[in-house]
Amino acid sequence: MKKLFPTQEVGSLLRAPFLKKTITEREILETEYWGRLLGVDGYERLVKALRSGRYVREELYDWASIFGIRFFESAGLDVVWDGEQRRVEMYEYPMRSIEGAVFYGRVKVWDTETYNKAAITSEPRLTRPIYLDEFLFAKKHASRELKVPVTGPYTLADWSFPEYHYAVHREAMSIMERKRL
């Protein structure tokens, strides 16, 4: 029987220490500590690659996802995810898969938080499945049920400059035409 209230995380994890631009011995020791503590299979290979400086950046994101999954599994959560290790930011990540979105630069949201704001300059179209690769990778490495955090369409629209839609509305002749849009 399924649990009435399965446990799951809400939000993101901090980036894995080895995803920093500069990887020092401190980050390597932290990676080794967490790899051992979480029981990450093969973490020794990652530590060796970090020490030698011979690694592929994309592979580090794979490792970060595995560490995130193991973190939540070892915490005993019923439904897990990777803590959004591959995502730049919850808005920018999906917007990079939308044709018609042009990034204008960073805007301040909270005290020190910023995000890269886009404008919708033409009819928006999805260029690829946004979350599929993340899900398939996590599915291969998780031993628990998965959830995929999705940034909803309201947030994507609200956080974007609607230039295309303003232009379409300006071109409409009557109030009735505008209502149909």
Task: Show where each model-derived region lies.
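Domain-level signal for soluble alpha/beta catalytic cores
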Residues: 1-181
